[in-house]
C-alpha cells in the first residue's frame, strides 16, 4: 500500500535494508528500489547459525540490529544486481556460510605444510551462487589470498553471475 503511494521515495529511498516486526514474526528485505515492487520471495526470516528462526524482538535487536552485524549486513552481505537493477540481501544461512568461509581462509596458516589453496563445493540449493560469489569477494577484498578464482560449472551460470554481480 505505502509503495503505491510513493512513500519509498525521498528519505526512505536511502534505506538499504528494511526490518519489519509484529509480535509473532520478523522479516528483513532489501529496498525494492524506486518502483517499490515488493517481492515476498525476497522477504527473509532471521535465523541463528543452526537455521532456527529468531522472532523475539529482543533477540532481533541484539543480533540483526546490533552493531557490527547491521553494518556487516549492509556493507558486506548485500549485492547490487545490475541485471535487475535491485539490491539483494543475503539470507541468514548465506551470511553465516560466507562469513565462516572467509574466516577459515583468514585464520589458515597457508605457509605451513604443502597448502596452496582450496575450494568450496556447493550442492544444489537456494542461493549458492550468491553465497560463493560473496565468499570469493570477501576473501579477495581481505587480501587473505593472492588470487581468488570464481569458477562455475556452466557457461550460462558464469555469464549470469558476471551480469548480476559486475558492480
What are these regions (language model features)?
Residues 152:
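Conserved residues at beta->alpha junctions
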Residues 1-147, 156-167:
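ATP-dependent helicase/translocase motor core
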